[in-house]
Amino acid sequence: MKNPLLRPWLTEKSTGLTEDRGQYVFQVKLDADKIDIKMAVEEKFGVDVKSVRTLNSLGKTRRQNTRKGLVTGKKNDTKKAIVTLGEGQTIDFYSGANPKGDA
C-alpha cells in the first residue's frame, strides 16, 4: 500500500495525548491497517513505534430545508490512528514550516 497517512490530527485532545503520553494522532486512509501505519510512521519520521490503535468514525448525515424541499447529504467517513512512540522520541510536525513574515 502507498502511504496510508493523510495528515496529522491536531486538536486540543490530541495535543494533550502528545504532551502527556507521547502519543500522536493521524488521519489515515480507510483501508489502512496497523502494520502499514506503523511502517509508514517509522519510515517518514525515523522513530520507533511501540503500538498503533485505530478507530473508525462514521460520517454524519446532514439535512437542510431549501425552497425545493429537503436536501440530504453525508459527511465523509474517517479513520484515525493513535501511534505510541518509544521512550524519549518525538515527532516535530512544524520542522519544515517558516514563521510568518520570513521568506
Curated annotation (Swiss-Prot):
InterPro entries cross-referenced by the UniProt entry: Nucleotide-bd_a/b_plait_sf, Ribosomal_uL23-like, Ribosomal_uL23/eL15/eS24_sf
Gene3D superfamilies (UniProt xref): 3.30.70.330
Function as written in the Swiss-Prot or TrEMBL entry: One of the early assembly proteins it binds 23S rRNA. One of the proteins that surrounds the polypeptide exit tunnel on the outside of the ribosome. Forms the main docking site for trigger factor binding to the ribosome.
Record protein name field: Large ribosomal subunit protein uL23
One Gene Ontology molecular-function label: structural constituent of ribosome
UniProt record similarity statement: Belongs to the universal ribosomal protein uL23 family.
HAMAP family: Ribosomal_uL23_B (MF_01369_B)
Cellular component, GO, one term: ribonucleoprotein complex
Species of origin: Chlorobium phaeovibrioides (strain DSM 265 / 1930)
One Pfam family here: Ribosomal_L23
GO biological process: translation
Subunit organization: Part of the 50S ribosomal subunit. Contacts protein L29, and trigger factor when it is bound to the ribosome.
The entry's keywords: Ribonucleoprotein, Ribosomal protein, RNA-binding, rRNA-binding
SUPFAM superfamilies: Ribosomal proteins S24e, L23 and L15e
Top-level division of the source organism's lineage: Bacteria
